[in-house]
């Protein structure tokens, strides 16, 4: 396997280094995916906090030793033996990691506080007080619990849920948590049925006598015991002192006593028995009974700590008991000959231990003893004339090197001095060619002399042995032993008698006549032996009392459980509730019961208030006869209008202009017929339902009223927009906007060409300037007009009379404006797609008595076709109808049963009307709660939340689909609760295809199979123009079934309705029975869904899975007004620190090689989806220019090199920017809605309305313009003076160019995307000079806003931003909201222009100048002279316009003001498209995404965050104020810029960065909150304090900053 993995890695590296770009990209992607998987796996490791202060080397040591944990080193606590103390927590977690979670566990000598903090309620700690140190340690554990509880109390918190059981157990039965008995004497036993039992021993094993260990384990029925002990292998080899350098500890042995202590520390020593330690090391079997033994197995060695486990073994399974284990007889008798009891015991152990019979195991567990030998040393005493012997451990190669060398000496040269000289020479360092080379063997110099004597004696004896063997052997008259002694005497000379005694005594030479007799008398005793500490009384260690804290926590939990039944309990302020209970000294449980009783009206106290929603206001108002008449009343700006005054007066305020309407009040004058609608004044249609009305009656009646009003509002919006199209006399062109058409009666041509023809009605403008509605008729294809008609406006909403006819018929069913509530029984059939509505119910409907209603004509035709397939005509136009058909042409007939298909797509009031009109006894409403619901497309009309739920009597669930194939059915499992089954025999049906653009599709060259479906109406019209027939949108075919479906997406703009959770995607995927193919121009979530479904294995297609994600509420730290202290940031680190931090936050970006991307794009074939434009291909090849080399950055970031402008580069930028604008807007009455939005804008952001109404006249005047001109530069005035003003300037013509430097994104998109350049669309200098004064004056006017609550970031310094956010109250919990809008400038359309135009008008802008500005932002022409491109754009914000910045700021403020309750905002800041808002926590916000899509055409996402992010800066709060940090990651990205021309340019960059990032030089907070804020945005971010220090270091030093860039590239 290792060989295969090596081959794969080598092949992958070869692929990366190859020349094939595609293979390189795939290989890099594979390496990236592998790295991501590895990092994700690391993040899943258990997390451990290491608070002790240790060195960097020790940090690396700990990290490498414990790879199972994700360790965070805080270095915040100085302590004695910091490394060993911190390792103790890691060692405990490692031991507990081996134990199955929840299994009963004994911790021998353990830390019960550590287990309480981890919530382990299954651990019992045996904590005997064997010495004073144990008592001290146990008191410290109780102190840690006290500190923890006091910290919770100080912060008004309770014990967390995961710790409650453990703390309850300690409070109720402390002896079950810990006892003062030894493990052998412990009497605590878990329940018998609690499963296997375990034990852990952390540095406590040596305190248990070895002969008691097995019996103690079996008495607790321990299955496995895991132990960790500190051990030095040299201690087993008669060493009297051994140092453990890694943890700074020392073992010291004196006889059988072993002391353990830490160097240079005054802490008490640990004492153990040497024999006990030795037994635990050398024994493998620990007998527990005649049958059971515990077998020891070493696990791992980490930082001087040995881990092992003792496993319970039943020896009867091996057919032998422990007593039958025999001993090695040779070792046994050899041991008996030795008089030392210690050696005899050791020999007995050698017969049992299995580990030392395996050389590999010995080398593994004793790595330092590998290739080491024990050599005796001889030392003589001058005074006593005696010689002593000791032993030393040296390297085996060293010994044989010395012996082999000196064995070559001649007899005369073999002296002690020569041997010592050679040993010293090979031990010393050697200098070779001026370089010092260290000796291979590290032998202590102190033992070289006695060691040389040993080598000398061994060589002498070996030489003597050789002489005896090789010499001629003669006995003569001496015995053999005498001859040998003679030879030995000749060899050693005069020292022979002493040497003889020593050799015989040490068994180097042995004779039979001398017997070994050793007697060791007790010569002395030590002072320690005389010191005896006796205890006269035994005391139990008292337990810590935590009952009070647990009682408080229990009471709070009970109180919150009681309060959870209240409506809106998720918004309950727990902190205020706790403060109230504490201030009033009342039990939380009692207070909660009182609150619930009051809320449920069980206390005798009636609440006179409720949340003023539409639902509650409707309940509070009484129904009176006067409410049937709703009138319109013009209101002045001084009158405060609210929904309560509207309901009381029965009048509606006129929000828009009256268009000449003089009556103060208009009674209900509904149009009785279509004839009344013909030539009706537009004012009578527009001024209907322009404000939110509080409805009365039952909920069904309220829904029906709302539906009628929504039809009127839709008609009003359509007529209003048509009137606006007729008033826009400038800019008509035949290249229309598709939705609206304007016919010029005089010229007999379309000024704006509509997408379709044959409109039923429209709005007419006559020569007198009056506008009225008209019913249209045709003679052939020509529209019939009258002589006084000037223009006719139509739209896609005027094709039929639907809304008009519906209003007419529904009002006829109402009596005095009150609809009748339907009395029929209503049953909701909630079924999955294809659940068999037709097969199960529709096939059994009665021809004469039942009625089936469907949304569209296609569905009605399908049902009729199926019902009549047998030849018998059962379904007709009378009993199978569309919803619109029944509402527009009701027939006076009652039905027994009513079937409404896709009823949840309809307005709830519409469903109620259908039931009422049909006169049925029971109504079955078929729908799918997961598919597309009813969408309110009239954005200026309210559709309250409580109206969305259909009121039914029964709900029937259906979870079996007869339509969907197996792969689609698998997709449905994640959408519905419960199992979704299918009866389809088709397993695989979905596929996708990428197309190069809409130009690829043609009905002849590329026919599409089956039903053709699109997501948007724009794509539908595009396909119809290309010749495709029978095309519908997804919304239109909901509820229908087809064998084959072709789904087409031609819009490259991101669509919010295409997502994994979108109901549109669900509907699109569930319309087919056989095949489904998706044609798309971009990769989107639906492509990913299809890819995932295609890769499923066959057996998975029959499985189901339902998962629900958890929601978390983000909270933000509170602050209060104050000031920031200044503490200089340390200047440390180097550029590798910056590179490391950048790679961690944005992994893979630094590996992108983008130097030749622009060249590659020019050389390769490109498929571009281009809108209408004119291209000059003569400029496709740019002129070669000499480019001066730029400075090369040392840091590798995603920064792109500068690009040269050209046809291709500019065209790509224009396609991705200007041609990629979203089209999401629904039906809007533009002028009326803009007026309402601007009203909210001024009401929300300005202190008083009078402030900007009274000062307008004195601002936009000639004098004010002259004052502005006095402050302008002479160059601008000269340009204006020389300009020819005989005619209006070309206000609608703009120039186009691109920025040479692409904008860096702080994401990973650079790895798979060619970033488009930013476009600049700008006016001429003369036009900018004219409009510059207007922009400046409007900026001054906007200073009238409420500066305490809102900040418009115009000419503000970072210090002013910081000051603005410094007064937030730290005691008020807040939600930080950030609206992220993509393509902000390009999304702005006619509605945005109307809003901005209305704001400028109210600020006093001259009418003529305002009209000039408006025409300059409507239909505009763009010319790019460098690239040779010309195109036309409708609206869109121009990036080079003088009003761009102030206009964008105003639009984002108006947008948020129209969607969010700005009266409740705490703080808000706006700058261009950036915004950040602070609201009180717990507010209910509307559907921001839907409103932003349908009203503002914004692809927006609303984020709730903990920290604010505004204009590239993090807003960090603390208890003394706020600090605004420039985004460090953005700053580091700029340090990798590749467009720096020279060092002067580089210095300008440094000064600029110093100005914006000055706050990084203040270290008063130490950057922890900044790290948390960055982590909130970049999930892979780590603690970046080291990088921030490094940034500050480089920015503060001009010359050091230069080292980040190299001269030349």
Swiss-Prot record:
PROSITE patterns: ALPHAVIRUS_MT (PS51743), PSRV_HELICASE (PS51657), RDRP_SSRNA_POS (PS50507). Residues 1374-1487 form the RdRp catalytic domain. Pfam families: RdRP_2, ToMV_Hel_N, Viral_helicase1, Vmethyltransf. Keywords: ATP-binding, Helicase, Host-virus interaction, Hydrolase, Inhibition of host innate immune response by virus, Nucleotide-binding, Nucleotidyltransferase, RNA suppression of termination, RNA-directed RNA polymerase, Suppressor of RNA silencing, Transferase, Viral immunoevasion, Viral RNA replication. One of its GO terms (biological process) is symbiont-mediated suppression of host innate immune response. It catalyses: RNA(n) + a ribonucleoside 5'-triphosphate = RNA(n+1) + diphosphate; ATP + H2O = ADP + phosphate + H(+). Residues 828-1080 are annotated as: Helicase. Residues 799-958 form the (+)RNA virus helicase ATP-binding domain. In resistant plants, is bound by host protein Tm-1 (e.g tomato Tm-1 AC A7M6E7), thereby inhibiting replication complex activity. Belongs to the ssRNA positive-strand viruses RNA-directed RNA polymerase family. This protein is translated as a fusion protein by episodic readthrough of a termination codon. When readthrough of the terminator codon TGA occurs between the codons for Arg-1111 and Gln-1113, this results in the addition of the RdRp region to the replicase. Heterodimer of a large and a small subunit. Both large and small subunits interact, via an ATP bridge, with host protein Tm-1 (e.g. tomato Tm-1 AC A7M6E7 and AC A7M6E8). This is Replicase large subunit. It comes from Tobacco mild green mosaic virus.
């Amino acid at each position: 396997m290792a060989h295969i993995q090596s081959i794969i890695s080598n092949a992958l590296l070869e692929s990366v280094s190859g020349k094939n770009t595609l293979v390189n990209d795939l290989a890099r992607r594979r390496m990236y995916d592998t790295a991501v998987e590895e990092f994700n796996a690391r993040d899943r490791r258990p997390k451990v906090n290491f608070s002790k202060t240790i060195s960097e080397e020790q940090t690396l040591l700990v990290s490498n030793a414990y790879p199972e944990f994700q360790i965070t080193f805080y270095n915040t606590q100085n302590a004695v033996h910091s490394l060993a103390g911190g390792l103790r927590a890691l060692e405990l977690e490692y031991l507990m990691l081996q134990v199955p979670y929840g299994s009963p566990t004994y911790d021998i000598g353990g830390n019960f506080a550590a287990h309480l903090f981890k919530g382990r309620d299954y651990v019992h700690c045996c904590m005997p007080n064997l010495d004073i140190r144990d008592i001290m340690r146990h008191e410290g554990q109780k102190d840690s619990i006290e500190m923890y509880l006091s910290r919770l109390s100080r912060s008004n918190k309770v014990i967390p849920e995961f710790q409650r059981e453990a703390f309850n157990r300690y409070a109720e039965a402390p002896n079950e948590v810990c006892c003062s008995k030894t493990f052998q004497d412990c009497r605590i036993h878990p329940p018998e049925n609690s499963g296997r039992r375990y034990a852990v021993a952390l540095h406590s094993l040596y305190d248990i006598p070895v002969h008691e260990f097995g019996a103690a384990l079996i008495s607790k029925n321990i299955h496995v015991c895991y132990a960790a002990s500190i051990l030095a292998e040299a201690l087993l080899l008669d060493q009297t002192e051994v140092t453990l350098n890694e943890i700074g500890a020392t073992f010291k042995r004196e006889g059988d006593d072993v002391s353990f202590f830490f160097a240079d520390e005054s802490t008490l020593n640990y004492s153990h028995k040497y024999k006990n330690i030795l037994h635990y090391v050398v024994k493998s079997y620990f007998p527990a009974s005649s049958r059971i033994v515990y077998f020891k197995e070493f696990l791992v060695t980490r930082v001087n700590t040995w881990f092992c486990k003792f496993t319970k073994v039943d020896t009867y399974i091996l057919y032998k008991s422990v007593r039958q284990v025999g001993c090695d007889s040779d070792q046994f008798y050899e041991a008996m000959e030795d008089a030392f009891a210690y050696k005899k015991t050791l020999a007995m152990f050698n017969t049992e231990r299995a580990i030392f019979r395996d050389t590999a195991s010995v080398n593994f567990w004793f790595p330092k003893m590998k290739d080491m030998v024990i050599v005796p040393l001889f030392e003589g005493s001058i005074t006593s004339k005696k010689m002593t012997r000791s032993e030393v451990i040296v390297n085996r190669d060293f010994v044989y090197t010395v012996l082999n060398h000196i064995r070559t000496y001649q007899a005369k040269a073999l002296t002690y001095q020569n041997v010592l000289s050679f040993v010293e020479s090979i031990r010393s360092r050697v200098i070779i060619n001026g370089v010092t080379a260290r000796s291979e063997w590290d032998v202590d110099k102190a033992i070289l002399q006695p060691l040389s004597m040993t080598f000398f004696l061994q060589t002498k004896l070996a030489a003597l042995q050789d002489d005896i063997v090789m010499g001629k052997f003669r006995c003569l008259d001496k015995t053999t032993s005498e001859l040998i002694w003679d030879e030995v005497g000749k060899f050693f000379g005069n020292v022979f008698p002493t040497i003889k005694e020593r050799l015989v005594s040490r068994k180097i030479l042995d004779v039979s006549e001398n017997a070994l007799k050793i007697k060791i008398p007790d010569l002395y005793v030590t002072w320690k032996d005389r010191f005896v500490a006796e205890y006269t009384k035994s005391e139990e260690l008292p337990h810590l009392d935590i009952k009070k804290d647990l009682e408080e926590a229990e009471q709070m939990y009970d109180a919150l459980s009681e309060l959870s039944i209240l409506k809106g309990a998720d918004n309950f302020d727990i902190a205020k509730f706790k403060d109230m209970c504490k201030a009033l000294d009342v039990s939380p449980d009692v207070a909660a019961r009182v609150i619930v009783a009051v809320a449920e009206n069980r206390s005798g106290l009636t609440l006179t208030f409720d949340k003023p929603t539409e639902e509650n206001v409707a309940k509070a108002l009484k129904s009176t006869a006067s409410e049937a008449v709703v009138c319109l009343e013009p209101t002045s700006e001084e009158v405060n209008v609210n929904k309560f005054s509207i309901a009381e007066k029965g009048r509606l305020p006129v929000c828009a202009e009256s268009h000449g309407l003089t009556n103060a009040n208009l009674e209900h004058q509904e149009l009785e017929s279509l004839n009344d609608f013909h030539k009706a004044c537009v004012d009578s249609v527009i001024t209907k339902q322009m404000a939110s009305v509080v409805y009365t009656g039952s909920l069904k009646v309220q829904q029906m009223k709302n539906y009628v009003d929504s039809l009127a509002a839709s008609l009003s919006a359509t007529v209003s927009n048509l009137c606006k199209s007729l008033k826009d006399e400038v800019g008509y062109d035949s290249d229309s906007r598709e939705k609206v058409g304007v016919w010029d009666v005089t010229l007999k041509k379309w000024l704006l060409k509509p997408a379709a023809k044959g409109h039923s009605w429209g709005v007419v403008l006559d020569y007198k300037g009056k506008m009225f509605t008209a019913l249209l008729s045709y003679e052939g294809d020509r529209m019939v007009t009258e002589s006084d008609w000037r223009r006719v406006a139509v739209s896609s909403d005027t094709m039929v009379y639907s809304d008009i006819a519906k209003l007419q018929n529904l009002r006829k069913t109402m009596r005095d404006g009150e609809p009748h509530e339907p009395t029929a029984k209503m049953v909701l059939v909630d079924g999955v797609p294809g659940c068999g509505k037709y097969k199960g119910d529709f096939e059994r409907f009665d021809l004469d008595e039942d009625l089936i209603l469907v949304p569209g004509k296609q569905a009605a035709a399908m049902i009729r076709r199926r019902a009549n397939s047998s030849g018998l005509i059962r379904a007709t136009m009378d009993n199978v109808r569309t919803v619109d058909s029944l509402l527009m042409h009701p027939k006076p007939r009652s039905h027994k049963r009513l079937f409404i298909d896709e009823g949840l797509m309809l307005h709830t009031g519409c469903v109620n009307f259908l039931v009422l009109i049909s006169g049925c006894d029971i109504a079955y409403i078929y729908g799918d709660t997961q598919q597309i619901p009813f969408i309110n497309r009239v954005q200026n009309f309210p559709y309250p939340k409580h109206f969305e739920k259909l009121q039914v009597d029964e709900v029937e669930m259906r979870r079996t689909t007869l339509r969907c194939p197996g792969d689609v059915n698998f997709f449905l499992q994640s959408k519905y609760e419960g199992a979704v089954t299918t009866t389809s025999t088709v397993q695989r049906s979905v596929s996708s295809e990428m197309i190069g653009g809409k130009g690829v599709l043609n009905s002849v060259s590329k026919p599409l199979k089956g039903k053709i479906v699109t997501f948007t109406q724009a794509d539908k019209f595009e396909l119809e123009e290309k010749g495709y027939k029978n095309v519908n949108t997804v919304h239109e075919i909901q509820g229908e079934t087809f064998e084959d479906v072709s789904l087409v997406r031609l819009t490259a703009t991101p669509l919010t309705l295409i997502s994994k959770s979108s109901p549109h995607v669900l509907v699109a995927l569930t319309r087919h029975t056989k095949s489904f193919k998706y044609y798309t121009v971009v990769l989107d979530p639906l492509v990913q869904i299809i890819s995932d479904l295609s890769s499923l294995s066959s057996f998975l297609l029959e499985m189901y899975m339902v998962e629900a994600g958890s929601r978390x509420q983000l909270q933000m730290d509170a602050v209060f007004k104050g000031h920031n202290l200044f503490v200089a940031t340390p200047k440390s680190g180097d550029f590798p620190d910056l590179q490391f931090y950048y790679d961690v936050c944005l992994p893979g970006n630094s590996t992108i090689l983008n130097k030749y991307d622009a060249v590659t794009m020019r050389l390769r074939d490109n498929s571009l989806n281009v809108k209408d434009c004119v291209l000059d291909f003569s400029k496709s090849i740019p002129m070669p220019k000499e480019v001066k080399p730029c400075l090369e950055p040392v840091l590798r970031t995603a920064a792109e090199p500068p690009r040269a402008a050209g046809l291709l580069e500019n065209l790509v930028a224009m396609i991705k920017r200007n041609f990629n604008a979203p089209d999401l807007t629904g039906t809007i009455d533009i002028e009326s809605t803009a007026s309402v939005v601007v009203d909210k804008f001024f009401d929300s952001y300005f202190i008083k309305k009078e402030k900007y109404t009274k000062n307008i006249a004195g601002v936009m005047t000639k004098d004010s313009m002259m004052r502005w001109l006095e402050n302008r530069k002479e160059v601008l005035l000269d340009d204006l003076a020389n300009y020819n003003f005989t005619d209006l300037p070309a206000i609608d013509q703009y120039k186009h160019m691109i920025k040479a430097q692409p904008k860096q994104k702080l994401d990973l998109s650079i790895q798979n995307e060619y970033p488009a350049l930013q476009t600049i669309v700008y006016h001429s200098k003369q036009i900018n000079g004219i409009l510059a004064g207007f922009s400046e004056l409007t900026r001054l006017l906007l200073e009238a806003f409420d500066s305490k609550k809102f900040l418009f970031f115009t000419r503000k310094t970072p210090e002013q931003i910081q000051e603005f956010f410094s007064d937030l109250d730290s005691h008020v919990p807040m939600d930080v909201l950030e609206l992220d809008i993509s393509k902000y400038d390009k999304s702005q359309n006619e509605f945005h222009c109307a809003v901005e135009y209305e704001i400028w008008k109210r600020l006093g802008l001259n009418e003529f100048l305002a009209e000039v500005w408006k025409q300059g932002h409507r239909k505009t022409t763009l010319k790019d002279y460098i690239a040779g491109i010309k195109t036309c754009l409708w609206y869109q914000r121009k990036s080079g316009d003088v009003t761009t910045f102030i206009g964008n700021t105003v639009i984002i403020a108006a947008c948020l003001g129209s969607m969010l309750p700005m009266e409740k905002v705490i703080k808000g800041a706006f700058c261009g498209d950036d915004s950040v808002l602070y609201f009180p926590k717990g507010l209910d916000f509307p559907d921001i995404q839907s409103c932003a899509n349908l009203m503002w055409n914004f692809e927006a996402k609303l984020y709730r965050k903990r920290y604010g992010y505004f204009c590239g800066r993090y807003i960090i709060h603390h208890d003394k104020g706020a600090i605004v940090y420039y985004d460090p990651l953005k700053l580091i990205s700029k340090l990798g810029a590749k467009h720096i021309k020279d060092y002067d340019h580089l210095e300008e960059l440094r000064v600029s960065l110093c100005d914006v990032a000055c706050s990084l030089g203040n270290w008063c907070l130490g950057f922890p909150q900044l790290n948390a804020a960055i982590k909130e945005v970049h999930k892979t971010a780590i603690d970046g304090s080291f990088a921030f220090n490094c940034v500050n270091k480089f920015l503060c030093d001009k010359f050091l900053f230069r080292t980040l860039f190299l001269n030349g590239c």
